[in-house]
Curated annotation (Swiss-Prot):
It comes from Mycobacterium tuberculosis (strain ATCC 25618 / H37Rv). It is an enzyme of class 2 (transferase). One of its GO terms (molecular function) is magnesium ion binding. It comes from the Bacteria. Signal peptide: none annotated. It holds the Pfam family PP_kinase_C_1. Belongs to the polyphosphate kinase 1 (PPK1) family. This is Polyphosphate kinase. InterPro entries: PP_kinase, PP_kinase_C_1, PP_kinase_middle, PP_kinase_middle_dom_sf, PPK_C_dom2, PPK_N_dom, PPK_N_dom_sf. The lineage of its organism: Bacteria, Bacillati, Actinomycetota, Actinomycetes, Mycobacteriales.
Length: 742
């Protein structure tokens, strides 16, 4: 067990040498000539306090804590709780691979640029380490003390080797020798065998063995294979009545793979004594950049960088909390890990593998099955009607997963591919599924002789390999594949279909908030606009020309496009909302801004919202993840509330509403630097009153005082809402009931 003393990090011991300018204030003595008084501020309302931002990294950890709260919620179906434990773990892995890795790189390079809330990279790393250790311990305790016993009560057991009887051990001996032993490679460490490379996110056993002859001890590492199931399913047993109720259900029993390997270490090290063994796991830096302006072939350059990703420097070491001091010291030394990057975990490491447990066939322990409904505009009729005919009658707003993706957006692309009157299809692809029907439709369209353009973002993090494969498949089919603009990720969700209709050419469009991915569309909440509006069609034509050619159009008719137009466009609308509010009078103004997004970090947008709040505009923010805005602070944000909704579906849509100026916008951009400065993003205005009424209903549901959520306080703390004793409604459940297929 690692002592608290050893956990004192360099972050705490090393003084921060950077001093802020205000700490060098010079005060003259009594005999010196005093400076003139400071200038009176021109506008007090424009002066914003320096502590107005919350730290974005700590806010992300708060988001993951909300995920963990769902896992701890005993009102949730049991296997859904296990699922949220897995999501928490995989979320934290990615946070360390990207965000923590970036902070460590800046710290190691001596780049002491402070965050918006005034912290250096080293100070942030210190706070992240402390908060992560607390969260990791809580995560483990929710599993060990709550979810694991509850699984046992339902006849689902995760057992240890000590729990098995001799017959089970004999069967597992055969399984080990036939299925596991051949793929294991025990690696010794001695003068002839250097310390082995440990790949990122792999689960390993650190083993100490002793030679019986002279008592010499040696270290060895055994990697738990990642191409076999983490949990070995044992032969079924009849569950006890207590565990399985009166149904006589057989018990499901699983043994962690590391337990099986540990039991057979003598087979791996014959003739040696096993002194100790402990599980550990390393996380490596996966935050890399491709020098696009230097490399002629972006695809090849990206493939080279992907090959290097597995060799990134360590950013976190997770260890079982029973690991000895000597074993840990060896790992720290050989892996070049700082003590401050060690996370002690009670029980099992890497609970992301609980997805395997979630997959068991126990529907009563999961959310009730939900089948998305076909949007009424696209419902089957006695006389078949194409999507194009429907869109000629009017725009359609789809809300996934409540409205089926496959019978709306996917069908839109599939009909375009099969329609002989369609001349061209242009589409952006950021993340798509492994067997994507969208991509297959584009391939079919190209093979049918249509002009097909696909903007494939091969730099979509952790989906690079899949997107490279799709890009090559599309090119082989004759699709014109482009990778967007140098230095920018193409993150917008847009599709354009050009169709000949008699003597005219008509353009049909889709602008959405979510990816063209039929699998995640069943799990992610998103909205999309399907339209034949000429102005949006002309805008998307200009946008695709700028992405595939040398056009550098910066202004559009009905779109806001990053990196040049979204931040300025939003701030302009906030200011217009303030002006409209003031024009109505201090007590009669109807200024109200409602925002729904994944993250709110951009300081310029936040400051614009603060100024609007000071002017009396009511502001309501629904944010899934990071929020750097501090709501409810006296003198700056009394008129701002921030709430977060998490649940069965991942809230992914980005929607903006400015009531006084009567504008609704949807699109792909969150309010983050990367979205507004380093990505091609699109926001589209929704003008049809029938569709804006749908968006208004969505906001009203999310902001209902009885809606189950968390609310952010001025101190940066999130609080569950509503309080006990009040009626509670579930935002997503209410939408499912409204859209549920008959």
């Amino acid at each position: 067990m690692m002592s608290n003393d050893r956990k004192v990090t360099e972050i705490e011991n090393s003084p921060v040498t950077e001093v802020r300018p205000e700490e060098h204030a010079w005060y003259p003595d009594d005999s010196a000539l005093a400076a003139p008084p400071a200038a009176t501020p021109a506008a007090i309302s424009d002066q914003l306090p320096s502590d107005r931002y919350l730290n974005r990294e700590l806010s992300w950890l708060d988001f993951n804590a909300r995920v963990l709260a769902l896992a701890a919620d005993k009102s949730m179906p049991l296997l859904e709780r296990a699922k949220f434990l897995a999501i928490f773990a995989s979320n934290l892995d990615e946070f360390y691979m990207v965000r923590v890795a970036g902070l460590k790189r800046r710290d190691e390079m001596g780049l002491s640029v402070r965050s918006a809330d005034g912290l250096t990279p080293r100070e942030q790393l210190g706070r992240i380490g402390e908060q992560t250790q607390q969260l990791a311990s809580r995560h483990a305790r929710v599993f060990l003390d709550s979810v694991l016993p509850a699984l046992g009560e339902e006849g689902i057991y995760i057992v240890t080797w000590a729990d098995l009887d001799q017959a089970e051990r004999d069967r597992l001996s055969t399984y080990f020798n036939e299925q596991v032993f051949p793929v294991l490679t025990p690696l010794a460490v001695d003068p002839a065998h250097p310390f082995p490379f440990v790949s990122g996110l792999s689960l390993n056993l650190a083993v100490t063995v002793r030679q019986p002859e002279d008592g010499t001890q040696h270290f060895a590492r055994v990697k738990v294979p990642d191409n076999v199931d983490r949990f070995v399913e044992l032969a079924a047993r009849e569950a006890s009545e207590e565990a399985a109720g009166t149904e006589g259900r057989t018990a499901l029993r699983f043994l962690p793979m590391e337990e099986l390997i540990a039991a057979f270490l003598p087979v791996l090290f014959p003739g040696m004594e096993i002194v100790e063994h402990h599980a550990f796991r390393i996380t490596r830096n996966a935050d890399f950049e491709v020098e696009e302006d230097r490399d002629e072939d972006l695809l090849q350059a990206l493939e080279r960088e992907l090959a290097r990703r597995r060799f990134g420097s360590p950013v976190r070491l997770e260890i079982a909390d029973d690991m000895t001091e000597s074993m840990l010291e060896l790992l720290l030394r050989e892996l070049d890990v700082h003590p401050g990057d060690v996370i002690e975990v009670p029980g099992l490491l890497d609970l992301s593998s609980l997805w395997q447990i979630y997959a068991v066939d126990r529907p009563t322990l999961k959310d009730r099955t939900f089948v998305p409904a076909t949007h009424p505009a696209f419902a089957e009729r006695e006389t078949p009607k194409s999507i194009f005919a429907t869109l000629r009658e009017g725009d359609v707003l789809v809300h996934h997963p409540y409205d089926s993706f496959s019978t709306s957006v996917q069908r839109f692309i599939e009909q375009a591919a099969a329609d002989p009157n369609v001349l061209a299809i242009k589409q952006t692809l950021y993340r798509t599924s492994g067997d994507s029907p969208i991509v297959r439709a584009l391939i079919d369209a190209a093979e049918a002789g249509k002009q097909v353009v696909a903007l494939v973002e091969i730099k979509a993090r952790f989906d690079e390999q899949a997107n490279i494969a799709w890009a090559r498949a599309l090119e082989q089919a004759g699709v014109h594949v482009a990778y967007g603009l140098v230095g920018l990720k193409t993150h917008c969700k847009t599709a354009l279909v050009v169709r000949r209709e008699g003597p005219t050419i008509r353009r049909y469009c889709h602008v959405g908030t979510g990816n063209y991915n039929s699998k995640t569309a069943r799990l992610y909440e998103d909205v999309g606009l399907l339209t034949a509006a000429p102005d949006i069609g002309a805008d998307l034509t200009d946008l695709f020309n700028s992405l595939t050619g040398y056009s550098r159009k910066l202004s559009y008719r009905n779109l806001l496009v990053a990196p040049h137009g979204i931040r300025a466009g939003i701030i302009d609308r906030v200011e217009r909302e303030v002006a409209a509010h003031r024009a109505e009078g201090a007590h009669n103004g109807k200024g109200r801004i409602r925002l729904k997004m994944n993250a709110l970090v951009d300081e310029q947008v936040i400051d614009a919202l603060y100024r609007a709040s000071r002017a009396g505009v009511r502001i309501e923010v629904v944010v899934r993840g990071i929020c750097a805005l501090r709501p409810g602070a006296q003198g700056i944000s009394e008129n701002i509330i921030v709430r977060s909704i998490l649940g069965r579906f991942l809230e992914h849509s980005r929607i903006l509403h400015f009531r006084a100026i009567d504008e609704f916008w949807i699109g792909s951009a969150d309010m983050m630097h990367r979205n507004l400065d380093r990505r091609v993003e699109v926001m589209a205005q929704v003008k049809n009153p029938r569709l804006t009424a749908q968006l208004d209903e969505l906001f009203e549901s999310a902001l209902d005082p009885c809606t189950r959520c968390w609310e952010l306080g001025p101190d940066g703390q999130w609080t569950a809402s509503p309080q006990e004793g009040h009626s509670v409604r579930d935002h997503q459940e209410s939408l499912m009931e409204r859209h549920r297929s008959p």
